[in-house]
Regions:
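Rossmann-fold NAD(P)-binding glycine/threonine-rich loop
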Residues: 165-237
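Substrate-binding/catalytic subdomain of NAD(P)-dependent oxidoreductase enzymes
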Residues: 19-38, 221, 225, 245-279
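Intrinsically disordered, low-complexity segments enriched in small/flexible residues
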Residues: 1-69
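Short glycine-/small-residue-rich Rossmann-like dinucleotide-binding loops
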Residues: 157-158, 186
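Phosphate-coordination loops involved in phosphoryl transfer and adenosine-cofactor binding
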Residues: 67-72, 135, 150, 178
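NAD(P)+-binding Rossmann beta1-loop-alpha1 motif at the extreme N-terminus of oxidoreductases
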Residues: 55-116, 139
């Protein structure tokens, strides 16, 4: 159970009551506690979350017929985020081309991948053969040209509009015309990033959360010119990667970062007004 939930303690109370009293009294007490719980704001919130998670992963207007098979992926940027994203694909059995301009950073990323999988073997999470398979499926390189046969490339470089625009242009220059390009930006305007490209319909957002190979949430961002084909593909890809893939629109910080940004401001406002959240 999660901290603060009412139902687990109610279950304990009902069980204790059933031991200490007769059958009829226990049934009546259990019914009373159930009515309290099922009509509580907490129950309403939990039901909303349950159905919202399922609706959010199935955006309207997208068809499974438009999903493009992803047989090989590219990741540009071998920092913490790029390394984690590469492992997301490797974990799903998708070979990865990892592009990084800094040779030292690239070597460090490859070592991190190997160390992570060695630890997984030591802890019994994967077999040694799986470790070798995943490591062999990673192709580290300094050259954008190595992306030529990728079905999708995820950009995961520094959060700077100019830097990302240059990187995206280099990616597009070396990709097939039908390949998809995803940016991992956490707050930049996807439409502005795609504006200078020849095929903006192939550009989408895939906002992973760090550590990318562990965190389940994935914000797939719908740009103004993102094609239904591109959007349907990243939704299906998110599921294949084992993520809760939620489609969001272009906005400042999208959804998760926007909530995170606003929460401290709300808390500070309460503190300044000497207001407790319970009030």
């Amino acid at each position: 159970s999660h901290r603060g939930q009412l139902a687990p303690q109610a279950c304990v109370d009902v069980a204790e009551r059933s031991v200490a009293s007769g059958f009829d009294d226990s049934v009546a007490y259990g019914r009373e506690r159930f009515r309290e719980l099922v009509t509580s704001p907490q129950a309403q919130a939990l039901r909303h979350a349950f159905f919202a998670e399922r609706v959010a992963t199935k955006p309207a207007g997208l068809s499974a017929d438009e999903v493009v098979p992803i047989r090989k992926a590219g990741v540009v940027g071998a920092g913490t985020m790029g390394t984690g994203i590469a492992m997301c694909f490797l974990n799903a059995g998708i070979p990865v081309v990892l592009v990084e301009q800094n040779e030292t950073v690239l070597a460090s990323s490859v070592e991190t991948v190997g160390k992570t999988y060695r630890n997984d073997v030591a802890k019994g999470r994967i077999a040694e053969a799986m470790q070798r398979t995943r490591c062999d499926a990673l192709t580290p390189t300094l050259r954008y040209e190595s992306l030529h046969d990728c079905d999708i490339v995820v950009e995961a470089v520094f959060e700077d509009m100019g830097v990302k625009q240059q990187v995206l242009a280099s990616i597009e220059e070396n990709l097939r015309p039908d390949a998809l390009i995803a940016t991992n930006t956490s707050f930049l305007d996807i439409d502005a990033l795609a504006a200078g490209l020849r095929r903006p319909e192939n550009v989408v957002g895939m906002h992973f959360f760090s550590p990318a190979h562990i965190m389940k949430l994935l914000e797939n961002v719908r740009g103004a010119r993102s094609s239904p084909r591109a959007l349907a593909t990243i939704q299906a890809l998110g599921k294949r990667l084992g993520k809760v893939a939620v489609m969001v629109g272009v906005s400042d910080g999208f959804v998760a970062t926007g909530c995170w940004r606003d929460a401290p401001a709300s808390a500070t406002s309460c503190w300044r007004r000497e207001r407790c959240p319970s009030r």
